[in-house]
Amino acid sequence: MKNAIYTVAIIVILLTGTVQYLAAKRERQAAAAYPPTGQLIEVDGVTVHAEVMGDGPDLILLHGASGNTRDFTFQFADRLKDRYRIILLDRPGLGWTDRAGPDYGGVWSTDHESPRVQARLLKAAADQLGAENPIVLGHSFGGIVALAWALEHDDLAGVVPVAGVANPWPGELGWYYRVNGAAWGSALVVPVLSAFASQDYVNATVASIFEPQAAPEGYIDHVGPALTLRRGSMRANAKQVNWLRPHVVEMSAEYGQINVPVEAVHGDADTIVPLDVHAAKLPDQIDGANVTVLPGVGHMPHHTHPDDVIAAIDRVAARAGLR
């Protein structure tokens, strides 16, 4: 009996070690293939990755879940840098930004950065970069961080939620977030996914995010999904999403306090962040908020319909007196 127990223990240790070794190897490869494209700045001991380009009024771009600044530098930012000073920021735990402090990042925990915590950290980073009265655009999860920015601070020109999370949703999230956002999944499942996730899995995931449109050619190679498959990033992402809803409930009750222009852009075929649950309610919650509805468009309008998103940015700039 003892020999059997020892044998099982040795097998478990070997398997665990193999998984961790393979995950670490893939993380090193991801870091080499997709290094920081901007600068690493320190905010109260937290490293924040920021990329600055262009000239004009300040425009901050916040990526969504599983993303990083490369989502915007694929093509979108180039369309704007001739008339805006663009500040791209990796959200906590994703890309090359650290978790927001020592209270986060535990393997066997569900500690996560709320939208308000993220907004405060990224606002401090933007301040270091000299941002003045910025427009804050947030895609998907970045949308709720942009709205938190407006609730936490009043020195911004306006908010552009793009397919942005804004209101509480019914039902449960999918298994990926419920499992990996739990303490046991964070510790046990994340390393396995990090070690063995295939390119087919990545391709299928990206395709589902863009549906019903198709991802642009070259997008996957540029954006670097391997960065998100790192154990630390997977944990940060899953926990932030899995435990997001209570924060959205709290924030949505305060939207009436937002007194800056809000111009949302949302596709009516978005099944990830549905229009009717999220952006469609904003005009009743925020005085003067507008929503541009894109018929037949899914979750990635800044790639599939960039002109509509740029027009929303320009409307905020005009309403705020920046143009």
Where are these regions (language model features)?
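Flexible "cap/lid" loop of the alpha/beta hydrolase fold
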Residues: 159-191
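Catalytic active-site module of serine/aspartate enzymes centered on a nucleophile-bearing elbow/loop
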Residues: 287-323
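Active-site loop/oxyanion-hole signature of alpha/beta-hydrolase fold enzymes
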Residues: 51-53, 88-137
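Conserved hydrolase catalytic core segment
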Residues: 132-171
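Alpha/beta-hydrolase fold catalytic core
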Residues: 1-59, 81-84, 109, 113, ...
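Conserved HGGG/HGGXW glycine-rich cap/lid loop of the alpha/beta-hydrolase fold
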Residues: 46, 53-98
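Short beta-strand/loop motif that positions the catalytic acidic residue
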Residues: 258, 264-266
